[in-house]
């Protein structure tokens, strides 16, 4: 089982993460999906793989996810991307790394190329969902759903047994973080 720790981002915000560091080793950085956490099979499978192959490992829970502080409704792609870059700078430092992004984590991963393009040596998207807020949600919302989101600032999207709080600020921020149909500069 993973040993979780917390990294203090600010006086009021802490991010839960797993980090396992092998001296002189490159990193595997795992980023989970929308409203997910580090309790699932994927992060633990990649941690196990990293340990077996003596690769350093980092995975984190964005604010409002899992046991990290904050409320989900206050988060967005920009905020979660920034939190990710803070932890990469803290733990990976100047070492090379491979990014693994699951669902929304792939979108957060692609945003990391803007900062770490010389350090990133590989990228794996699992069920990659960049720009899903616009393409898979907003464009598929009915007129009534859009009106409620605009009026209330939030829409409780029911999907199966789950309910997802989709805020207007989350949708708008997603539009500021477009990565599809754009060139990604990497080594």
Language model region names:
Residues 99-101, 126:
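Short beta-strand immediately N-terminal to the catalytic nucleophile in serine-hydrolase-like folds
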Residues 35-41:
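Short substrate-entry loop that stabilizes the transition state in hydrolases
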Residues 107, 119-187:
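The alpha/beta-hydrolase serine catalytic core
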Residues 1-23:
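N-terminal cap/lid segment of alpha/beta-hydrolase-fold proteins
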Residues 66-91:
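Catalytic nucleophile-loop/oxyanion-hole region of alpha/beta-hydrolase
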Residues 101-109:
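Gly/Ala-rich beta-loop-alpha elbow adjacent to hydrolase catalytic centers
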Residues 43, 47-69:
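Conserved alpha/beta-hydrolase
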Residues 25-33:
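Short beta-strand element of the alpha/beta-hydrolase
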């Amino acid at each position: 089982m993973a040993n979780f720790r917390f990294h203090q981002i600010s006086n009021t915000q802490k991010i839960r993460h797993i980090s396992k560091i092998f001296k002189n080793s490159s990193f595997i950085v795992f980023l989970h999906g929308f409203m997910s956490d580090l309790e699932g099979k994927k992060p633990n499978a990649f941690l196990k793989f990293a340990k077996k192959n003596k690769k350093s490992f980092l995975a984190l829970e964005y604010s409002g996810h899992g046991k990290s502080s904050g409320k989900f409704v206050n988060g967005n792609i920009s905020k979660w991307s920034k939190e990710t870059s803070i932890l990469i700078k803290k733990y990976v430092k100047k070492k090379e790394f491979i990014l693994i992004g699951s669902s929304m984590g792939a979108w957060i991963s692609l945003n990391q190329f803007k900062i770490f393009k010389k350090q990133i040596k590989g990228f794996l998207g699992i069920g990659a969902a960049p720009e899903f807020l616009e393409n898979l949600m907003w464009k598929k919302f009915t007129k009534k759903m859009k009106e409620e989101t605009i009026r209330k600032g939030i829409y409780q999207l029911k999907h199966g047994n789950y309910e997802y709080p989709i805020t207007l600020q989350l949708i708008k921020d997603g539009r500021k973080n477009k990565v599809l149909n754009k060139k990604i500069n990497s080594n």
